[in-house]
Amino acid sequence: MNSQLANAPNAFNYIESHRDEYQLSHDLTEILLQFPSTAAQFTARLNRSCMKIDHCVIEYRQQVPINATGSVIVEIHDKRMTDDESLQASWTFPLRCNIDLHYFSSSFFSLKDPIPWKLYYRVSDTNVHQRTHFAKFKGKLKLSTAKHSVDIPFRAPTVKIHSKQFSHRDVDFSHVDYGRWERKTLRSKSLSRIGLTGPGPIELQPGDSWASRSTIGFPNPHTESEVENALHPYRELNLLGTSALDPGDSASQAGLQRAQSTITMSVAQLSELVRTTVQECINNNCNPPQPKSLQ
């Protein structure tokens, strides 16, 4: 999703963490954020409320020499997702650039679960030693509660640069896109005999589903099959048996079988075989007759 530089909102009712020093690391390292107290979370839970992050600010203040090089990558992860899909937003900026990072959440979370958001950083392509206390991070959180979740208008991440020698051309940031959705039809025994006879409202019959009825359309098997085959060329392979899907032996297996079934000989071995065979023929068929003795 597109992100752009924008004015950050003013701080109001923010929960602030301490401005702590962090060691330089090439691996993802967690930045500790201060969340609402256990008592506040318990009160919200009693009210059966859910919670979201209205606004998150990450302040970065570097403390490295002026000839230090490298890039800092900051990531926000949502631990409700699988590890390979948990990344929500990320920023990349120069190691010597003092900057504020702004993030706006687009979802609620239940207080019955642990707070899912985690903040990490790492440094790449740098000439500064690892484990050097290279910068200070400070987090500010503004959270809100609601009786139930609602759709939240998307707000792109933003940055505010405090170092004059850097500009928006030196930083980059991104946000995850909306997840894709493809409707799955419900299978039933009546699907094979369903058909629409004319334009008019779709009426569900026993054993039908709205998805299956609304995607069948007018009976035109050629048009439907061409469109479906173009969109999903392998959609019905699961109906074939395993023997039909078996491609047979691989090239390596076929080559191995040929190698095992073929006798290979060198030129010297072949010459020796011919010489031995000829010699055996001469010995067996060309011996002179034995002279008869006179009695």
Curated annotation (Swiss-Prot):
A Pfam family that the UniProt record links to this protein: Gemini_BL1
Keywords tagged on the record: DNA-binding, Host cell membrane, Host endoplasmic reticulum, Host membrane, Host microsome, Membrane, Phosphoprotein, Transport, Viral movement protein
Example of a GO cellular component annotation carried by this entry: host cell plasma membrane
Domain of life: Viruses
Gene Ontology terms describing biological process: transport of virus in host, cell to cell
Family of the protein in this entry: Belongs to the begomovirus movement protein BC1 family.
Name assigned to this protein: Movement protein BC1
The organism of origin for this protein: Cabbage leaf curl virus (isolate Jamaica) (CaLCuV)
